[in-house]
């Protein structure tokens, strides 16, 4: 009999291993029961089975985010700094955005914008709690959708991540800018700044210039304050229909 106190994939497999060792004459029966047990586990139980280790190599300070005249700013380490997103928003060409709003209509464009932001926040909550090894559940329709989006990111995007230095990390470049990145850790053996993004549809490389600039700015800030040598940035994108994409910035592209 398989006995599992707090069922997760790892506890089920561990118990199954012990049972198979005791009953070598009936492995197929046990394996079938293990598969049935795994299928009975919901996605939330998978989401709490984080295998990413905490590494305290870097010590991060917690910044306070505030709005000033509609712009996001940070109060961190004695500095009051504009956010990276605020700077990018004020310097980018908004021609396409204006055309999109004109095509969709102001009301519909605002609805899509709000929906996307809410979906992104929900997906981030699942991912943050997964990294920290905490349980999190949102039983709303939106929460159930973003649970599966987060699971896709975990299965594909976070699989190469062996350790993390910090989750939801406030980063700042003294006197210039600040921001919050989703994860800093070891990705495929390299110190990496990682950002999670939701998207309404798959992205093309040429559409994500701001994502790249944002991630690169975080890497520069990390190196400046913590004396690190961030080797790459990885941007993990997932759509509501679970299409996953990954964009990397490294080498000269990260430093230029």
Descriptions of predicted regions:
Residues 2-9:
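Extreme N-terminal basic, low-complexity initiation segments
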Residues 9, 20, 30-31:
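Alpha-helix boundary/capping motif
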Residues 12-16:
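Residue-level detector of structural "landmarks"
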Residues 22-24, 32-33, 37:
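Basic polycationic patches enriched in arginine
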Residues 38, 44-178:
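Metal-dependent nuclease catalytic cores that hydrolyze phosphodiester bonds in DNA/RNA
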Residues 165-256:
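Mg2+/Mn2+-dependent nuclease catalytic core
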